[in-house]
Amino acid sequence: NELRQIMLSPRELASDSLPNKNWINERLTFTHGYGVAAGPVNQVTSSGQPEFFIKDIPPQTTTSLKITRPEIYYGELANEYVLVRTKSQELDYPAGDQNIYTTYQGKGGVPIGSFWRKLVFAAHHASMRILLSQDLTGESRILFHQKIQERVKKIAPFITFDPDAYIVIAQGGRLFWIIDGYTNSARFPYSAPLSRQGMNYIRNSVKAVVDAYNGTVEFYLSDPADPIIQSFAKTFPHVFKPIDAMPEDLRAHVRYPQDLFTIQANVYATYHMQDPQVFFNKEDLLSIPRRTIEGRERDMEPYYTIMRLPGEEKEEFILLLPFTPNKRDNMRSWLAARSDGKNYGKLTALEFPKAKLVYGPKQIDARIDQDTIISQQLTLWSQRGSQVLRGSLLAIPIEKSLLYVQPLYLAAEQGSLPELKRIIVAFGNRITMDETLDL
């Protein structure tokens, strides 16, 4: 009965990387990806490698999580088209010195058994092999528009879709993709533009769900009050469903989108000022913290975490971003977007007292570099021929201050997998480094 944040990574098939690229391999044999790797974000093995809840092929699980339909025919790296239920076997996964094959049993695609259909698709895909292949039978089907971004855009071209789709495991063990959809405009009255394109209105009005096996697509109204999506819903009444119609096991995975939150954070940096005179003079502008990562200075990105917000009784899944005063490095405030239950979409902000110094991310980076114990250890690792990789610096609100956590990974120069070796924690004026966060 505890909230646990986990990472999921689908094992998709990148046909561009096939060692032996030919029409049969690309269209008949290597037709789909297989399964996911999943594990907790805060656990590693004794050697510093990720701890897995789901691993291997076929998927092996150590928890109640299960995958009953691991094949991924529709995803982010899918083929232009594939042919299934043919005389050629589809590779499912390798097992030792042999391969395991399968036959597609889903309802995706369209039949391609007749001569005329073969002719039409051969012309459409500019491939005479579709028309002339002896591998096709009366039961064969062609699966196309397998890339999920392309698929949802074909159905709803009037919606702008988030490029960062994420895969989830439904309660029955099936895999689904969730994609955030936006309605936007550049013609909203009395609204400042957000970009060079002039957009001054945006709403996360749609959640698209794509079945990774069958390719079926459902659109759910996540912001039914948006007048633009109301108009589209009336025009296409059978395309959109209310968010309450989304199955509960999928709805539990819905999260607040990072791109929308980043836009709102940039607006909040100016419009958090309530006093008209202060606002007019821009006396209290905020900035998104900047950090030096791999030699380049970049804006800090919002990140998902589980924490208990001030005034709340229990922890929840949120999207968080801290702020610094304009052209200064100390921390000024943070903004959080909530994702759980009835609180979905609510934004919470907390400002630190101006009289209290709370270190910002750039200042913490500098203090880590200046710490003699930490710098000596980093130098020692580097002298032994290892590469030190500093992970994301997370700022976790603790009452009216911040706890900073940064993992350190070690990798050999000859391409070995990085291993978690140390964790740096900073709170107030204290900085420490240890092998674990456990007390």
Question: Which ranges hold each PLM region?
Answer:
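Soluble extracytoplasmic regions of secretory-pathway and membrane proteins
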Residues: 1-439
